[in-house]
Amino acid sequence: MANIASAKKRARQAEERRLRNKSRRSEMRTSMKKVLKAVKTGDHDQAQQAYRGAVRVLDRSANRGIIHKNKAARHKSRLNAKVRSLAG
């Protein structure tokens, strides 16, 4: 355990950020699962709507530093390919 006040504060801040990031990461994963579930059922409109929501969450996560921008782009690309496969 830290003895110096600034180190104690940093430990507190790190824990708060860890919990916040955990929540945001969970939100991101849930939004992606909604898209995959809609694709699995074959509902194109619902999949499209879920995809739009997932893109927002992924972009927000990338901008906040929860995930890397390339990882967000990769997820969006793969989800979009699955949604497009329903259309044609």
From Swiss-Prot:
<dbReference type="GO" id="GO:0005829">
    <property type="term" value="C:cytosol"/>
</dbReference>
<keyword id="KW-0699">rRNA-binding</keyword>
<feature type="region of interest" description="Disordered">
    <location>
        <begin position="1"/>
        <end position="32"/>
    </location>
</feature>
<keyword id="KW-0687">Ribonucleoprotein</keyword>
<dbReference type="Pfam" id="PF01649">
    <property type="entry name" value="Ribosomal_S20p"/>
</dbReference>
<dbReference type="GO" id="GO:0015935">
    <property type="term" value="C:small ribosomal subunit"/>
</dbReference>
<dbReference type="GO" id="GO:0070181">
    <property type="term" value="F:small ribosomal subunit rRNA binding"/>
</dbReference>
<dbReference type="GO" id="GO:0006412">
    <property type="term" value="P:translation"/>
</dbReference>
<protein>
    <recommendedName>
        <fullName>Small ribosomal subunit protein bS20</fullName>
    </recommendedName>
</protein>
<dbReference type="InterPro" id="IPR002583">
    <property type="entry name" value="Ribosomal_bS20"/>
</dbReference>
<keyword id="KW-0689">Ribosomal protein</keyword>
<keyword id="KW-0694">RNA-binding</keyword>
<comment type="similarity">
    <text>Belongs to the bacterial ribosomal protein bS20 family.</text>
</comment>
<comment type="function">
    <text>Binds directly to 16S ribosomal RNA.</text>
</comment>
<dbReference type="GO" id="GO:0003735">
    <property type="term" value="F:structural constituent of ribosome"/>
</dbReference>
<feature type="compositionally biased region" description="Basic and acidic residues">
    <location>
        <begin position="12"/>
        <end position="30"/>
    </location>
</feature>
<dbReference type="InterPro" id="IPR036510">
    <property type="entry name" value="Ribosomal_bS20_sf"/>
</dbReference>
